[in-house]
Amino acid sequence: MNQFHTGGTAEIATSEKIGIRHLYISPGHNFFGHYGGPPDHHPIVEVPAIECVAGRGLRGDRFIDYKENYKGQITFFAWETYESICVHLSVWKRSPSVFRRNVITTGIDLTTWIGREFEIQGVHFRGTEECRPCYWMDLAFADGAEEYLKGRGGLRGVILTSGVLRVNV
């Protein structure tokens, strides 16, 4: 159940029921900036914790210091969406890491955080927009993934306060 409190001028959404199932970082871009060409082959690494650096991104990730005020310093993807796409496309042997989102959450509808500030494990974020799927999703996951993920591709955000997120599920 979400709780709301006012801190300064912003309303911050918090929830004690948000789970973090997986955390991922990657040192390089496989698909981003590769439109019309082949993907690259940078690994995506699962980690037990990630360091969020306010205004910059995730320590060790490809988007840290990408550009000033970048709206995708961190990305979130719902475990529930992962489960539903696996069922919908009958794909059972792909990790959620193929979607190249940083934080795999459970227990929250990520679309409710678009345009809002929220807090997870003491770290504050602002949801900026849906992390829209691209045509690479069909290659990375399965045919039909891009279409299925429209409107549920995850959340892009900026990091407002520094801190550490940890897997807790």
Feature locations, PLM:
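Short glycine/proline-centered loop/turn elements that form peptide/ligand docking sites
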Residues: 160, 164-169
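Glycine-rich active-site loops that engage anionic ligands at enzyme catalytic sites
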Residues: 105-161
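Electropositive, beta-rich accessory/interaction domains or terminal extensions
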Residues: 1-120, 129
